[in-house]
Amino acid sequence: MKAVSIYPVSESALTICLGNELNAVVNDRVFRLYNHLRKQVNPFWKDLIPAYCTLTVVYDIKEMRKHSQSAFKWVSKQLKEAIDQCDDAGILPSRQLSIPVCYESEFGFDLKSLSKAKKLSIDQVIKLHTAQTYRVFMLGFLPGFPYMGIVNDKIATPRLSSPRKLVPAGSVGIAGNQTGIYPLDSPGGWNIIGRTPLQIFNPRVSVLTDTSLLQPGDEVKFYSITKEEFHSFDQENFNPLSA
C-alpha cells in the first residue's frame, strides 16, 4: 500500500494523498477516511473535499493554534491517527444501480463519430459501454456529476477539442477512460453517446435525503432502452436499485 503523503495547500488547508492510481482500492481509502471524519463531532474541520486519490481538509486555523504553534503539524498528526483507524475498517459497502440509457442518434451526439474513430459499429460501442460495471469515484464539476470508471480501452476517447455550449441534463458521455452523466443542462466537452431519462440530481428533495442519486463507491451498470421507452419513462415508480 502506498505511503501516505500530506502537504499544505494554504494556511488553513491540507491535502492527504492516499495513492496515485485510479482504482477502487485507493478510492476506498479516501472515502473511509472521509466518512470517518464526517462522523466526528469536531469543531476543527470546516470542510472535507474528497477526490479520486486525495482528501483535502479545511480547518479552523484559530482553533488549531490553541493546541500548537504549527497547525499543519498538529492536524497532520490527528489525521495520520485517523488513517490508521480507517485502514483497519475493511472494504466499504457499495450499492449496485442499473441506469437506462437511450443511445439513439438524437441523444448520442457523438456516438457515430466515436464509432468511426474506433473502427467499431455503433452497436459494438453500445455493447461495450453497457457490458461494464462502473464505480463512482467522485462527484464534481457540476452538483451530482458522477465520475465513473473504468471504460473499456476500445471506447476510451479524449474530450472534445471544442466543448459544446449546451449539453442536456441526463446526457451520458465518455472522456478518457471515464464515463459520466450530466445532472443539469450545462456546457461540456465529453463525448455524448446517449441520454438517460432518469433524474440523477434533485435540489428540491428533503434535507434528510441526498440531492444526488449517485454517491461515491456506488457501482453502476447501464442498459439500453428504445426511444419509446425513453419518452414513456416513469421516474416516480422507477427504482435503480432493483431495475
Residue ranges and their predicted role:
Residues 1-88, 93-243:
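Glycine-rich active-site loops that engage anionic ligands at enzyme catalytic sites
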